[in-house]
Amino acid sequence: MGYAKSAMLIFLLALVIASCATAMDMSVVSSNDNHHVTAGPGRRQGIFDAEATLMFESWMVKHGKVYDSVAEKERRLTIFEDNLRFITNRNAENLSYRLGLNRFADLSLHEYGEICHGADPRPPRNHVFMTSSNRYKTSDGDVLPKSVDWRNEGAVTEVKDQGLCRSCWAFSTVGAVEGLNKIVTGELVTLSEQDLINCNKENNGCGGGKVETAYEFIMNNGGLGTDNDYPYKALNGVCEGRLKEDNKNVMIDGYENLPANDEAALMKAVAHQPVTAVVDSSSREFQLYESGVFDGTCGTNLNHGVVVVGYGTENGRDYWIVKNSRGDTWGEAGYMKMARNIANPRGLCGIAMRASYPLKNSFSTDKVSVA
């Protein structure tokens, strides 16, 4: 009888482990698979905690997470479980987008903002962003493409990762310059955010900055270095060696700001070139976004620089293609489809409030067909 009881206990334990392992495999969310966290009706708290712990261990391995102490790991697990419940509940609502356990799943919303929000919402000293150009103002005769994706035209470099440096202002500026340089010269060159972080002293490096000030620096200081000449360190550094004779710096002639709160003008601009935008990325949905057309909670407290590299429509929902700087494990391989043509003229997350674009070699709208 003792042997029979032991065998039965071992069998039951094996069933529990197999059940938890299956739940883990079907629940870990990534941008590279088709499995999602799903709501489990009637799930008991204890079972949820057991599954969440297994998922957390798997997630740590996937994202290379190591914590300094057992106490810190427990704290991160608690945050992870809370984010998991949030994801489970939101995904059960059958929205146009999905959330997932990305690299930020062990961060509270406040912590996420502390490391990710680097766009300075204050105007530059000369208030240049208060004036805008009518270059891309729409008119009755405009016929724009139904969809645009500058990635397909080879005008977008690979997704980059700003790391723990609050340098989104540099990444968004650089992305727009890279795109325009490809359109004008035919050559896609990966440019240097570190050049701006180290040398653009009007901005604050990893402490944040303004895209307008970054454009002005590129215009007035010999262009922008390449990533090969000035590789990214995710740290503030010393400005040196940026104007060596053998450096292949990329120049721009200037930049312009789009009319504020005008998604139609933004659409016309994006039909011609990638555009820098500053958005509010401070919602939990933005933090944990995985896929689909995002129309979730979003304010207009502008704090994060991105690049708008296209637009389109999916299942009747218009969207912007937004390139982020948080690596290719966030969102759709580093991109977000953000809802377009919403009722608010500021655009979702304020995307139409503060958008700008570089100019190069007298590039103008008549050089690109929009029909």
From Swiss-Prot:
Gene Ontology biological process terms in this record: proteolysis
Origin superkingdom: Eukaryota
Q: Which residues form the propeptide?
A: 24-143
- Extract the signal peptide range: 1-23
For this chain, the annotated S-S bridges are C165-C206, C199-C239, C298-C349
| List of glycosylated residues | N94
User: SUPFAM superfamilies, from UniProt?
Assistant: Cysteine proteinases
**Pfam families, per database record:** Inhibitor_I29, Peptidase_C1
Which Gene Ontology MF annotations are present? Answer: cysteine-type peptidase activity; peptidase activity
**What is this protein's tissue specificity according to the annotation?**
Expressed in roots, inflorescences and siliques.
Instruction: State the UniProt keywords alphabetically.
Output: Disulfide bond, Glycoprotein, Hydrolase, Protease, Signal, Thiol protease, Zymogen
What is the induction note for this entry?
Answer: By wounding.
| UniProt-annotated catalytic positions | C168, H304, N324
Under Enzyme Commission nomenclature, its number is: 3.4.22.-
**DNA-binding as UniProt keyword:** no
- Would the keyword Nucleus turn up in this protein's UniProt record? no
Q: What's this chain's function? A: Possesses protease activity in vitro.
Q: Which family does it belong to?
A: Belongs to the peptidase C1 family.
Q: What is this protein called?
A: Probable cysteine protease RDL5
Annotated organism of origin: Arabidopsis thaliana
